[in-house]
């Protein structure tokens, strides 16, 4: 394994860690950074490169699980744990905590069902540069609409005030985000905001709901494709995983700290700029044709 290839693995892990849970579409960034630039399939082989992306995604998912470890233990009624960062002290004293396992399950159902039904179709027909650009752009517009609406909401709800109906609707939007480029977090956070949650609450629920789904999906994919991992490539996988996990920890904590302040529009603008950049490379220079 050449040093340059290990560096490429670290770069891809960093990109995955930065983008998996941000509302900017990790798929769009992987197409730009890997398929159009680093081309891991050329030195790993297409199947092994696909497996590598599963591994680094697991790195990001483990990072989110670690950030929300106390909340997950609390939902599962294991021990005594602190509140989710950002909840209001007076609200915690005046009413019992409402977020529970049923909220998470209700939110997971739509994406789980549609994932089982359409995963193969989506993987075969929708993972192209033009379809990802459409997802990036439409998702950006949806985020802008959500932010404009949220400005009119006087008392947005915290994550512990979420209802089962709100959880279900947010879950439906997670299913819609199966369209590559749309962004799971962009879709669900926007929907949560439209359902009168504050941005931090919508983000908290998005990540809490996404972790078990992504662990299951990535875990099953890895079980299907683990035989594609070559012994010589293991350092590549380890470095990519560690990069995704480490950067993911920093990115998720930073995002949750800032989201109530900066809202979604800056991410939407970034997505539109990204679409323009990818379009120039794809249509103007033919980079990425055949993906």
From Swiss-Prot:
- Which sequence ranges are marked TM in the entry? 1-21, 48-68, 102-122, 126-146, 162-182, 203-223, 231-251, 267-287
Gene Ontology BP annotations: cell wall organization; peptidoglycan biosynthetic process; regulation of cell shape; response to antibiotic
Could you confirm whether the keyword Transmembrane helix appears in this record? yes
Keywords, in A-Z order: Antibiotic resistance, Cell membrane, Cell shape, Cell wall biogenesis/degradation, Hydrolase, Membrane, Peptidoglycan synthesis, Transmembrane, Transmembrane helix
Q: Name one GO cellular component term.
A: plasma membrane
Report the EC number(s), separated by commas if there are several.
3.6.1.27
Q: Which InterPro entries does the annotation name?
A: UppP
Primary site of residence? membrane
Highest taxon, organism lineage: Bacteria
As for membrane topology, the entry says: Multi-pass membrane protein
Which reactions are catalysed by this chain?
di-trans,octa-cis-undecaprenyl diphosphate + H2O = di-trans,octa-cis-undecaprenyl phosphate + phosphate + H(+)
Keyword Membrane present in the record's keywords: the answer is yes
What compartments host this protein? Answer: Cell membrane
- Please name the GO terms that the record assigns under molecular function: undecaprenyl-diphosphatase activity
Q: What role does this protein play?
A: Catalyzes the dephosphorylation of undecaprenyl diphosphate (UPP). Confers resistance to bacitracin.
Please tell me what else the database record remarks about this protein. Bacitracin is thought to be involved in the inhibition of peptidoglycan synthesis by sequestering undecaprenyl diphosphate, thereby reducing the pool of lipid carrier available.
Q: Which family does it belong to?
A: Belongs to the UppP family.
* Protein name (record): Undecaprenyl-diphosphatase
Source organism per UniProt: Staphylococcus aureus (strain MRSA252)
